[in-house]
A protein has these predicted regions:
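Generic hydrophobic/packing signal
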Residues: 67-71, 107, 121-125
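Glycine-rich loop at the start of a catalytic domain that most often binds anionic cofactors/ligands
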Residues: 54-69
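TRNA-binding/sensing appendages of the translation machinery
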Residues: 34-53
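A gly/proline- and charged-residue-enriched helix-loop-helix capping module
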Residues: 74-105
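Conserved short loop/turn motifs at secondary-structure junctions
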Residues: 51-55, 170-173
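C-terminal end-helix/capping segment
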Residues: 68-78, 309-316
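Active-site environment of non-heme Fe oxygenases that use a 2-His-1-carboxylate facial triad
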Residues: 1-29, 42, 97-103, 112-316
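Glycine-rich nucleotide phosphate-binding loop and flanking beta-alpha elements
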Residues: 55, 109, 299
Length: 316
């Protein structure tokens, strides 16, 4: 198997050409692919298996299971709309095709997060639809010292989850239950602050680091999705519309502040997004491709698209 690399800014994607048809995979071939993938992940943080020829969810599940690590079988507490397809395999998102999904580290707002993300393209879109990636160390290094310090002090992710009718996801959908005791146990174990609202909704605040140490390199890396949780991230004028429909920012489905409660300024958000654009790498999907992402090292997103796109994901 041969590999090549592609680089944008400080982000490098390793492309491993498997050069094997879907019906020619055997255990020896998979062992070779897994070994090469681990080596490349250690070097670059993201690897694309090109030509893997994965045809369906069943084959993807079998392939991912062989990489080791227990598959995460529940997305409880997650804010992204997605569907479960089989044990440990989900749609990557149900977010509308006409919108981009900005760069982020998966579940960085949670107490626990996946180490690795495995994406597989079962149907490639007509246009767009790539899963862009961005090196977290490069992103952090592109920010001014003062901004790095503010994120290093931490961020607070705030949610208002309605009880069945309202903006955004309900707490029932978010936590996959209508049992308040189950929700309270989950949030308590997560170290989150929470309170039930008089209208049946739920307020949640999670204090998390904005920067973490990357054990692979020993250096600090960006690890948050604060800009994604800010209403200015919403497409078109939806952020302003949401603000006009609520009495307070605390009633927004998502809201984020620095650790001391200070809101993120427009200038800070602009600086973060400019750095993301500088280091964002885009590689179009081909049917059967598999992309493996070290979640602590590399951010990912989704480009808007046309046509039919089916990209599934597993997490370990």
């Amino acid at each position: 198997m041969r590999h090549e690399t592609r680089t944008t800014g400080g982000t490098t994607l390793a492309i491993l050409h498997t050069e094997t048809s879907a019906d020619a995979w055997d255990e020896a071939r998979w062992q070779e692919a897994r070994g090469r993938t681990r080596e490349l992940l250690d070097s670059y943080g993201v690897v694309l298996l090109r030509g893997a020829g994965i045809p369906d969810v069943t084959a993807f599940h079998a392939a991912v299971s062989g990489f080791g690590g227990a598959l995460i079988e529940s997305y409880r507490g997650g804010n992204t709309p997605r569907k479960t397809l089989s044990d440990g395999v989900f749609t990557s998102t149900e977010y509308p095709a006409r919108y981009d999904i900005t760069l982020h580290n998966e579940l960085s707002y949670a107490r626990g997060w996946p180490d690795r993300l495995y994406f597989c393209c079962l149907d490639a879109p007509d246009t767009g639809g790539a899963t862009p990636v961005c090196d977290g160390e490069a992103l952090l290094g592109a920010l001014s010292p003062g901004l790095r310090e503010r994120f290093a002090a931490g961020v607070v992710y705030r949610q208002y989850l309605h009880g069945g009718a309202g903006l955004g996801k309900s707490w029932q959908d978010t936590f996959e239950t209508d049992d308040r005791a189950v929700v309270e146990e989950f949030l308590t174990e997560s170290g989150a602050d929470f309170a039930w609202a008089a209208d049946g909704g739920l307020r949640v605040a999670q204090h998390r680091p904005g920067v973490r140490k990357n054990p692979r390199t020993g250096r600090d890396t960006w690890f948050n999705q604060a800009d994604q949780w800010h209403p200015s991230n919403l497409p078109d004028d939806e952020g302003e519309l949401l603000l006009s429909l609520t009495d307070s920012v605390d009633d927004l489905p998502h809201w984020v502040t620095y650790a001391d409660g200070t809101p993120l300024s427009d200038e800070d958000l602009a600086e973060v997004r400019a750095a993301q654009r500088e280091h964002k790498l885009i590689e179009s999907w081909q049917r059967g491709d598999v992309m493996i992402v070290d979640n602590l090292s590399v951010l990912h997103g989704r480009e808007a698209f046309t046509g039919t796109r089916k990209v599934v994901v597993s997490m370990t």
